[in-house]
Amino acid sequence: MSRENIIIGLDVGTTSIQAVVASKSKTQEAPQVIGWGEAVSRGMRKGAVVDIEEAAAAIREAFQKAINHAGIKNAEAVVSIGGGNIFVRPSKGVVIVSRADREISREDIQRALLQAEAIPASPNREILHNLAREWTVDGEKGIKDPLGMTGVKLEVDTLVIECGASALKNLRKAVSLAGIKIRELVLSPLAASYAVLNPRQKELGTLVLDIGGSTTGLVIFEEGDIFHAAVLGLGSSHATHDLVYGLQVDVDAAEKIKKTHGSALAESTSSRDMIDLKKLGGENTIQRKEVATICEARFSEIFDMAQKELKRVGRASMLPGGAVLTGGGSRIPRLDKLAKKDLSLPITRGVAQRISGPEEIVQDPAFSAALGLVIWGFDETFNRATMENPSESKFVGWLKNFIP
């Protein structure tokens, strides 16, 4: 199998790193997972690299497990970034259609997207994505696919996602030190949404909450395109730290308690259920309801931050597709019930779509971003093959929505 048919998704998180190897032939509709690996993160804080050598060692561990499992020596990786001071702003590109017959070509589409990137990033920031939201031809708005249409002026409204330049530079250094060639960098919650949302959800208007260890990614889709993205500064590890202080146990014990006895909804937890902390380094026996109360408070804070972000962009209680929960932090029981109460939206738990593989990987929310990175990578390969000028493909992002 040629190297072009193999892509690795590398999700570099604060608490863990997931790597997925997938292959796709011309006859396959969806990529097939052929290898995977996971490692405990080191040298990371709030989604950003703070120790390059430590981060590189952890990245190398997950990557090596994945390629050994897949039986390959190496391949390019689509790599996630989940922190580093993310900033989102709207932009616009306007061009005059170049052909004499005024038929819009791929080149015109490329020029419009590049024009939207012409506004430089804020100081100390770097443009990570420039995503098309809406096209306009001669004043006619709401066009999804301008290719082949006739007009004089082509406009595109885009969403530009910027990241701290130092955070990107440090991540690139860590991945390179791990011996991995980066194919592309992608915002982690964007990759997760790419895996868990179907076209109908994107069209209806849907929120994705990618709950990680120290951050929670937020992405909104509406009318088929991305509407907003953000990274919130709280994650499931904050609930673990709350358990450390509340129960007087160490971090490892608190994490184990959260995973084995945790719940995000105290009212549905029986007061008769008890946990013997002596087996976990504690000194007494407590009610399981106490653990649920601590966890619920922290996850409610995460949902409160998400609700404030929805209000800020005018989408609170206005998403017919509801909210989709994913990420390793979403594993805690009854989180969907709490989210429904706090967000006033229908809630579903997201699993990866458009990719096949073992259920323990494809249906594990902790692997959603890594799987989304693989899907993104194969879609970009398709874009590159269909572009008239392949060298410009990196600026196109999701041009698959506009090119048949």
Features from the language model and the residues they span:
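A structural feature that tracks compact, well-ordered secondary-structure segments
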Residues: 217-219
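A cytosolic small-molecule/anion-sensing beta-strand core signal
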Residues: 222
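Hydrophobic, well-ordered secondary-structure elements that form the walls
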Residues: 306, 325, 373
